[in-house]
């Protein structure tokens, strides 16, 4: 009889836990994806903070030239970063127990893998948690679809790109200047500015910002007056009210006359779908572009493609980008034995577009 009571008690405890996890009455929804998300994001955050502050230098290139990224080794918030794991590790999974000692693990950049893998699992779980909460509330699932754009971008720079290049040392460092360094090297090695998917991403991000500002300013300018001049117009809205808080007809008429009639949406639902879809699709394409360039399917190369009647090169913007890329690549590869192949195997190229007159 005692055993039966204990089993029922255990079953009821598990049932209570399940109900708490899936309850939409909690102040913050947990969900089954949250059970995975919370510990992984906590682990990634704690390790990132400790490594950013106190991690020793990392032999990122695998040539016994450690690079310091933490604050206590002389960096500041701008220059500091969690340095990617060593090129000597390559694509090997490198948890703490794979190293001979903790010092070796730190020297080879083990914290980077710990942070990145837990972070990726955490954001995947966060996306699943968005779907789960939408499902519990009977909503459509498009919130997690929109969030898939930054998830795809993070996966591209932290996972797909290292896979394509053959080493986690080529992943994006976890810091401000490290991000810019990654962007410069990416341009030097893959000519991303001349890749159409990157162009679509730029149109998505900047276009999304423009459309967001246009929509917000139009709505704010066509609010239905519910307050006096001495009150804030925000007091004219009551949460959950049935009537529209702004006049979409007035906004449509204004914008239709400012541009032309069919440039303005007359359907609020299609408008907001467009506002969501534009940046999401753009960022999807950027992530896809990085993922293809990871395997060296690079941007267009129009270098020295325009010649005059005598066969001399007429330098274009493509040539400027190419020469800038060569300079960035030389700075990136700091060692003679690791010199960029496209410089070492080709004829010398003048750096300046026009040599200055001397004397």
From Swiss-Prot:
GO MF annotations, alphabetized: chlorophyll binding; electron transporter, transferring electrons within the cyclic electron transport pathway of photosynthesis activity; iron ion binding; oxidoreductase activity, acting on diphenols and related substances as donors, oxygen as acceptor; oxygen evolving activity
Matching InterPro entries: D1/D2, Photo_II_D1/D2_sf, Photo_RC_L/M, Photo_RC_L/M_CS, PSII_D1
Bilayer topology: Multi-pass membrane protein
Function: Photosystem II (PSII) is a light-driven water:plastoquinone oxidoreductase that uses light energy to abstract electrons from H(2)O, generating O(2) and a proton gradient subsequently used for ATP formation. It consists of a core antenna complex that captures photons, and an electron transfer chain that converts photonic excitation into a charge separation. The D1/D2 (PsbA/PsbD) reaction center heterodimer binds P680, the primary electron donor of PSII as well as several subsequent electron acceptors.
Gene designation: psbA1
Residue numbers binding chlorophyll a ChlzD1: 118
Keywords: Calcium, Chlorophyll, Chromophore, Electron transport, Herbicide resistance, Iron, Magnesium, Manganese, Membrane, Metal-binding, Oxidoreductase, Photosynthesis, Photosystem II, Thylakoid, Transmembrane, Transmembrane helix, Transport
Changes after translation: Tyr-161 forms a radical intermediate that is referred to as redox-active TyrZ, YZ or Y-Z. C-terminally processed by CtpA; processing is essential to allow assembly of the oxygen-evolving complex and thus photosynthetic growth.
Positions contributing to chlorophyll a PD1 binding: 198
Binding site for Fe cation: 215, 272
Note: Cyanobacteria usually contain more than 2 copies of the psbA gene. 2 of the reaction center chlorophylls (ChlD1 and ChlD2) are entirely coordinated by water.
Classification via SUPFAM superfamilies: Bacterial photosystem II reaction centre, L and M subunits (SSF81483)
Positions marked as site (Stabilizes free radical intermediate): 190
Residues annotated as transmembrane: 29-46, 118-133, 142-156, 197-218, 274-288
Site feature Tyrosine radical intermediate, where: 161
Signal peptide residue numbers: none
Annotated binding of pheophytin a, by residue: 126
Binding-site positions, a quinone: 215, 264-265
Top-level taxonomic group: Bacteria
Organism of origin: Synechococcus sp. (strain CC9605)
Catalytic reaction annotation: 2 a plastoquinone + 4 hnu + 2 H2O = 2 a plastoquinol + O2
Gene3D superfamilies in UniProt: Photosystem II protein D1-like (1.20.85.10)
Entry protein name: Photosystem II protein D1 1
Cofactor binding summary note: The D1/D2 heterodimer binds P680, chlorophylls that are the primary electron donor of PSII, and subsequent electron acceptors. It shares a non-heme iron and each subunit binds pheophytin, quinone, additional chlorophylls, carotenoids and lipids. D1 provides most of the ligands for the Mn4-Ca-O5 cluster of the oxygen-evolving complex (OEC). There is also a Cl(-1) ion associated with D1 and D2, which is required for oxygen evolution. The PSII complex binds additional chlorophylls, carotenoids and specific lipids.
Propeptide residues, chain positions: 345-359
UniProt binding sites for [CaMn4O5] cluster: 170, 189, 332-333, 342, 344
GO CC terms: photosystem II; plasma membrane-derived thylakoid membrane
